[in-house]
């Protein structure tokens, strides 16, 4: 019996005459595209630098957070140690740029509005502005690689260039332009790696260059601010997806996947970790002199700082009655037990002297250890302090005793209030505390620095603790001290830091100085705790994440007669939201359509299989020999630079990662925290614009692009005084030149 012949279904070839023509002359098209690309890139560079460097040295006074980061740059130049909640790279670069451009580190940067006068501040502004300006060319090239569309790349770059908010953030001595530069560089490198891999360029010099550049950018981003973790997550997810697709490529051996994993682990994990550690090594090596941030760190950490009382310290190892000591809370970032002449206000417990913790060195941190049942010891008698002893602690300056009673604490109402009580060291039975060494034994001597102590109130049986809560203005925003009836409170541990006693022999404490990795870990613990504990200052304008995408309220950078106001270009921000919504709608619609097509393809395969079962054939025939369209229903190309919707999806993920986490943060938040997410939204807008109009005739595409570009340039011209400076009446006054631009009542310019 003759074998039956199965006819191969023919598929109509698709493609317009225009497409056939473009395939016939790819070289001329590529040359034309290259020229267009270079012309557009040069235009982006010129317009970006022109808008960013215009009036970059104005105003000639401190604006907003320049008071912090300019001051920290000065401390790097002077090698003075300080505490900050952010990693060090951004501030080191600010200090380096100032040093290289003639700034000597002596300007105090006390408060916004202070005139720079003859200070060479310009170099630091130029540096930050240059990095901020480089974001736009990188954004242009990133979108072009994702879409191969000049229109999409140009529109995305224009959305970044003509946003007055991003312009304002780029022109000052701040961490934000540095952070945004490295973040954009990470995304740029991520796309370049994907492009090189897809074109078969794995393991080439170019591929390795982009791999290590991306790892460098990732390390630098998180070394400026911890929010750099969000772009690390984005690149990590993208890399994992690429590796998964490589694993699924049956044309490649499994060894290829393992090689790709190893290469990316080296360049995107190990290399960034090494760089990050190196930045901290430089930071801790440069800042080797004692400063006002010493008290946030442990006593052992401080012993490495030149000028600190513990540096090469020689003091008594043992603690004795009559010792004048400072007592530091042992938790990460803990302060010194402190008092001053001010009383607790009415409604905050007994109106007795305040007891707080304070993170700076001060004579008000000093206490005298006395026996619980005697006022004074004979001057020539030495009695060591031991585990389990009952003592009174007299404040050296105010002569009041550390005291607690059954009144509730001012902030933590479940705790008892701790006060300073008595006169000239004479008080009552509520001044008595039992000293316990954590893990101590009977008659064990209390040692300076190394002994971890608890102070248990004799009558109330509560533990002296630092709750970590910040007191209001009446407490000078210092930390609350209370007495916790739960004596297992982890914040109830203390140590003696400074110890003075003329009868005790002194020993060197250099043996307790920690090495680099111990200080590296402690620095992170202190930074993370400080970041989580950031609270708004009284009268300070803060914001919540829901306000940011809608441009609800801005933020003053300079509130003098020369006003600078951080606010997004409303045309750009609100149209960004429109394109964000369009992406979600188109993506969901496309997903539904893809699922329906996949179902049709599976049904077609089952039908073919049933036909073969009923009529056996000796010939295996593909579903379609002239085109793979039915097969592509099950397997479609996933290369972002050929799939605008796939590219937009990754930019949307970037927007989500840089926006949604702020909803869960309890710390104080500000409007400028949204700008990393804004960059992703602006890139997404360009990609979606291209995706929506690409099927239209070219002349209509050009009209739409020209109209949108004209609109955002015009809106930039209207709102540019917000960035370049305003004077005269505020916008809420009818005679103000900005009156007609106050589109929302919450805008305060």
Swiss-Prot record:
Pathway(s) served: Protein modification; protein glycosylation
Gene3D superfamilies: 2.80.10.50
Catalysed reactions, semicolon-separated: a di-trans,poly-cis-dolichyl beta-D-mannosyl phosphate + L-seryl-[protein] = 3-O-(alpha-D-mannosyl)-L-seryl-[protein] + a di-trans,poly-cis-dolichyl phosphate + H(+); a di-trans,poly-cis-dolichyl beta-D-mannosyl phosphate + L-threonyl-[protein] = 3-O-(alpha-D-mannosyl)-L-threonyl-[protein] + a di-trans,poly-cis-dolichyl phosphate + H(+)
Ligase as UniProt keyword: no
Spans through the membrane: 34-54, 126-146, 173-193, 204-224, 226-246, 266-286, 572-592, 645-665, 669-689, 703-723
InterPro entries: GlyclTrfase_39-like (IPR027005), Glyco_trans_39/83 (IPR003342), MIR_dom_sf (IPR036300), MIR_motif (IPR016093), PMT_4TMC (IPR032421)
Region (Disordered): 1-30
Residue ranges annotated for the MIR domain, each copy included: 316-372, 382-438, 443-499
GO cellular component labels: endoplasmic reticulum; endoplasmic reticulum membrane
Molecular function GO labels: dolichyl-phosphate-mannose-protein mannosyltransferase activity
Principal location: endoplasmic reticulum
Keywords: Developmental protein, Endoplasmic reticulum, Glycoprotein, Glycosyltransferase, Membrane, Repeat, Transferase, Transmembrane, Transmembrane helix
Enzyme Commission code(s) on record: 2.4.1.109
Quaternary organization: Interacts with Rt/POMT1.
Family listed: Belongs to the glycosyltransferase 39 family.
Name under which the protein is recorded: Protein O-mannosyl-transferase 2
Organism classification: Eukaryota, Metazoa, Ecdysozoa, Arthropoda, Hexapoda
Gene it is expressed from: tw
